[in-house]
From Swiss-Prot:
Domain of life: Bacteria
Positions of ATP binding: 216-223, 279-288
Native organism: Vibrio vulnificus (strain YJ016)
DNA-binding region: 486-505
Keyword DNA-binding: yes
Name used for this protein in its record: Anaerobic nitric oxide reductase transcription regulator NorR
Stored PROSITE patterns: SIGMA54_INTERACT_1 (PS00675), SIGMA54_INTERACT_2 (PS00676), SIGMA54_INTERACT_3 (PS00688), SIGMA54_INTERACT_4 (PS50045)
InterPro entries recorded: AAA+_ATPase, GAF, GAF-like_dom_sf, Homeodomain-like_sf, NorR, P-loop_NTPase, Sigma_54_int, Sigma_54_int_dom_ATP-bd_1
């Protein structure tokens, strides 16, 4: 015991001298590996009934992207509930959350040694450390007293790091717990430089009243950014209201935004609040704001300028305290030059512009996100584990992801379903054959050639069937040329966005 404590006291100096929070965490786990001679370890943060990996040693990188629900992982639940050191018997039948994820071991973990150290501050769980060794007798000589010492040291280090983060990034917030404002429901996954910069910008603007314009390609996660801005602000206890401007028929757009009174138009059988009023005191997220007509842009501008709105059919002005976060995949300043977007509205919305980088510029985040989605689909399919094969990891890194994060999510979920269909086992591995990511076309998007082969038009079919086949081919061709962007497709086909979505559903494209 004395020898171990002496080692740790010496190492504490290294922990305190580390320049960054991540460096401290990595040093902690390296020390655990060296002192305890384990094969893998992980430092986990506890929030929203999930364990979130902050640092890992001896585990696949995808683990950093996973969020482990304690309800779905009995070993982690035991650690969370115990309040003290947990030793799992080498013959334990409880599934291990790291099955297939230890870097020097392929496949399911059978007999092995596993210990969980809950990290407690004032008897409140803030995290945990897990330690695994492939030798089932590796930790037999290790005393609980020694493990409690490690746990206390790690708990203090984690607590200090969280407090420093709160002071650095949330100094302007009221005194609520920072964890309440930054939870899994609005978490943005990514450690790349572009995403770290984005996180810093979100933290800077969240607790202001500035309008924010979120820019980025389709599928990068603009809605998630809006969600994070709202939940890290003083408005978090009020509504976040979503409106997809691209799917808004022109005939009802004004009513959707501002509401209407009874009798304002045919079918208006009662008073109805619009999105501005629904978001009063909170945040209104205008997705695809570049799709609004010039007429509606003028009315939106007035609401932003004066802080009041008029319901359709009503002469009264209603004061609203609504913050606007808008998003677009268009280059709005180019739209202004082309006369399709009002310059004054653009300047109102883009007081604080944010750019979400495409996934092809975030190579180091691809595997984190793949792990995140693999853990999600594991829970939904009721599996013990879903892991990525080494060859697949290499392919995921090399692919350029034209559909961005949304495409990655879809292909991981599709591959998991295919893998589950191949085997009755509860532990599955996703392999390259389950993916079709060798061409620029999204794997979830049928190609034009495939559509033409399936829907070649013959003279012996009816007019409606032939018309449907032609429309389907045309929409698929436009979608492919616009990289799956529905709003751009609607413009190319000169269709109302709402009508295009309805037509696509009828034709079986959506």
């Amino acid at each position: 015991m004395t020898s171990l404590i002496a080692q740790w006291l010496h190492i504490t100096q290294d922990l305190n001298s580390a320049l960054t929070r991540q460096a401290r965490f990595d040093t902690l786990l390296t020390t655990i590996r060296d002192v305890l001679n384990c094969d893998s370890s992980a430092l986990l943060l506890f929030e929203d009934q999930h364990f979130k990996p902050l640092a890992i040693n001896g585990l696949a990188k995808e683990v950093l992207g996973r969020r482990f629900s304690i309800e779905q992982h009995p070993r982690l639940e035991a650690i969370a509930r115990a309040g003290d050191i947990v030793r799992f018997p080498s013959e334990s039948t409880l599934p291990d959350p790291y099955d297939g994820l230890i870097t020097n071991h392929q496949g399911k973990l059978h007999v092995h040694s596993c210990i969980g150290l809950p990290l407690l501050i004032d008897d409140q769980l803030i995290g945990a450390i897990t330690i695994d060794a492939l030798d089932p007798n590796q930790f037999d000589q290790l005393k609980n007293q020694e493990l409690r010492f490690i746990s206390a040291l790690a708990a203090g280090g984690l607590h200090t790091a969280l407090l420093l983060e709160q002071l650095e990034t949330q100094a302007s917030l009221p005194r609520e717990s920072y964890a309440e404002k930054r939870t899994l429901s609005n978490e943005i996954i990514g450690n790349s430089q572009g995403m770290r910069t984005l996180q810093e910008q979100i933290d800077a603007v969240a607790n202001t009243e500035l309008s924010v314009l979120v820019m980025g390609e389709t599928g990068v996660g603009k809605e998630l950014v809006a969600n994070a801005i709202h939940h890290r602000s003083d408005r978090a206890s009020n509504n976040l209201v979503y409106l997809n401007c691209a799917a808004l028929p022109e005939s009802v757009a004004e009513s959707e935004l501002f509401g209407h009174i009874k009798g304002a138009f045919t079918g208006a059988i009662s008073h109805r609040k619009g999105k501005f009023e629904q978001a009063d005191g909170g945040t209104l997220f205008l997705d695809e704001v570049g799709e609004l007509s010039l007429e509606l842009q003028a009315k939106l501008l007035r609401a932003l300028q004066y802080g009041d709105i008029q319901r359709v059919g009503d002469d009264r002005h209603i004061r609203v305290n609504t913050r606007i976060v808008a998003a677009t995949n268009r280059v709005l300043h180019e739209e202004v030059k082309a006369g399709r977007f009002r310059a004054d509205l653009y300047h109102r919305l883009s007081v604080f512009p944010l750019h979400v980088p495409p996934l092809r510029e975030r190579e180091e985040d691809v595997i984190l996100l793949a792990g995140f989605f693999a853990e999600q689909v594991r829970g939904k399919l009721g599996l013990h584990s879903v892991r990525l094969s080494p060859s697949l990891v290499a392919e995921l890194r090399e692919y350029h992801w034209p559909g961005n994060v949304r495409e990655l999510e879809h292909v991981i979920k599709r591959a998991a379903v295919l893998a589950k269909a191949r085997t009755p086992q509860m532990d599955i591995e996703l392999i390259s054959q389950d993916f079709d990511i060798k061409t620029p076309t999204s794997p979830m998007m049928p190609t034009v050639a495939a559509s033409q082969a399936q829907h070649e038009i013959h003279v012996d079919i009816g007019l409606k069937q032939a018309t449907d086949a032609f429309q389907k081919q045309l929409i698929l061709r436009a979608l492919e040329s616009n990289q799956g962007n529905w709003a751009a497709t609607a413009r190319q086909l000169e269709l109302d966005s709402g009508n295009l979505h309805r037509l696509a559903k009828r034709l079986g494209i959506k």
